[in-house]
């Protein structure tokens, strides 16, 4: 069996055996595979913007945006498209090649879709890859986003099926898999990963990666998050994960999903430069860039560029910018907003009722 073979039939015992390798052997295997598929000194940079913050009805025990927990987070309405475009332009100027937009929803409502599809069109017109994370998607919603040109859709599995019920009770594991299936069927690329350091066992980290690697097609991007403990959430006092276990998770993800981008996501703000360097060597080749990830802290842009310089890394170049499309899209946007505003007489209707599931 080739070291570089793409497989979808991983046994959990095989993955656990990879986790158990001596660190030097694991890193050597992961880095060898990484060099086969990617330039090891190139890192894809994404910017993540919260386009609708707080008041989420879900009970994810790690999340400060849940309406069920008192975290001091102020809820915000869906951002105007012009504000999103301003942030997207800033992201591109700072070196990002992908712009991700996240909304704290269980799922978008149909009346939200015109706004969302216009956001996608306008951001793409700037020459950025686009990604959204909006919660669960129906088949029709997936098709609308794909039709607008959305490149990636993020929907994480979070953890293993076995540990999932200890983290979330308001959304089933199968519903997450169904959303990924809808996204893939629509033609969009899938971004899906999980969170480690939530009190799970090593077998749960193996189980999460098994679920991702055994999808019919591997996710195009696999974000691996280190839990950011937020006061007011049920997981605020959970024990820290050994940082080397995080590195092992990155390395195993690279080995069993050799063609996927593996992203260092939440938690980087508290990671040392040395730890991040190990993660890049282990196969991580994507980061979120900017001082905030939705509502949690992230390293400053200057810090990231300084680290890149010290490590000899360089940002991946994004697609060419069809800037001439922007004026046309902005005209369309103004007409769309005028039409859609008639459907939203009350500002509070732009939120989900946190008490209604």
From Swiss-Prot:
For this protein, the Enzyme Commission number is: 2.8.1.6
Q: Which domain of life is it from?
A: Bacteria
**Source organism (scientific name):** Shewanella denitrificans (strain OS217 / ATCC BAA-1090 / DSM 15013)
The organism's lineage is:
Bacteria, Pseudomonadati, Pseudomonadota, Gammaproteobacteria, Alteromonadales
Residues in Radical SAM core domain copies: 41-268
Record's keyword terms, sorted: 2Fe-2S, 4Fe-4S, Biotin biosynthesis, Iron, Iron-sulfur, Metal-binding, S-adenosyl-L-methionine, Transferase
Which of this chain's residues are annotated to bind [2Fe-2S] cluster?
100, 131, 191, 263
Q: What family does the database annotate? A: Belongs to the radical SAM superfamily. Biotin synthase family.
Q: Catalytic activity, per the record?
A: (4R,5S)-dethiobiotin + (sulfur carrier)-SH + 2 reduced [2Fe-2S]-[ferredoxin] + 2 S-adenosyl-L-methionine = (sulfur carrier)-H + biotin + 2 5'-deoxyadenosine + 2 L-methionine + 2 oxidized [2Fe-2S]-[ferredoxin]
| Essential cofactor(s) | [4Fe-4S] cluster; [2Fe-2S] cluster
Alphabetical list of InterPro entries matching this protein: Aldolase_TIM, BATS_dom, Biotin_synth/BioAB, Biotin_synthase, Elp3/MiaA/NifB-like_rSAM, rSAM
Protein name, per record: Biotin synthase
């Amino acid at each position: 069996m080739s070291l570089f073979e793409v497989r979808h039939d991983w046994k959990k015992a095989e993955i656990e055996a990879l986790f158990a390798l001596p660190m030097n052997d694991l890193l050597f295997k992961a880095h060898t595979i990484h060099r086969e598929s990617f330039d090891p000194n190139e890192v894809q940079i994404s910017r993540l913007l919260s386009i609708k913050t707080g008041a989420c009805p879900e009970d994810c025990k790690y999340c400060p945006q849940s309406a069920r927990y008192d975290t001091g987070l102020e809820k915000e309405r869906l951002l105007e498209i012009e504000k999103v475009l301003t942030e997207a332009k800033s992201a591109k100027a700072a070196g990002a090649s992908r712009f991700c937009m996240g909304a704290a929803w269980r799922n978008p409502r149909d009346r939200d879709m015109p706004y969302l599809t216009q956001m996608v069109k306008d951001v793409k017109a700037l020459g950025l890859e686009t990604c959204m994370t909006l919660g669960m998607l129906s088949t029709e919603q997936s098709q609308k986003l794909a039709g607008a040109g959305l490149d990636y859709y993020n929907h994480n599995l979070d953890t293993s099926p076995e540990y999932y019920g200890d983290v979330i009770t308001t959304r089933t594991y199968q519903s997450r898999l169904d959303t990924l299936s809808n996204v893939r069927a629509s033609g969009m690329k899938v971004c899906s990963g999980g969170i480690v350091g939530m009190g799970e066992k090593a077998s749960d980290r193996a189980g999460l990666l098994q679920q991702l690697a055994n999808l019919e097609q591997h996710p195009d991007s696999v974000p691996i998050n280190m839990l950011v403990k937020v006061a007011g959430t049920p997981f605020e006092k959970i024990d820290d994960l050994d940082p080397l276990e995080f590195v092992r998770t990155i390395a195993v993800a690279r080995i069993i999903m050799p063609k996927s981008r593996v992203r260092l996501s939440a938690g980087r703000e508290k990671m040392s430069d040395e730890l991040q360097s190990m993660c890049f060597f282990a196969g991580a080749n994507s980061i979120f860039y900017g001082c905030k990830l939705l509502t949690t802290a992230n390293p400053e842009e200057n810090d990231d560029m300084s680290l890149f310089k010290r490590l000899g890394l360089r940002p991946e170049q994004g697609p060419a910018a069809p800037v001439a499309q922007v004026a046309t899209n902005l005209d369309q946007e103004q007409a769309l907003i005028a039409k859609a505003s008639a459907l939203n007489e009350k500002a509070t209707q732009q939120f989900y009722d946190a008490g209604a599931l």
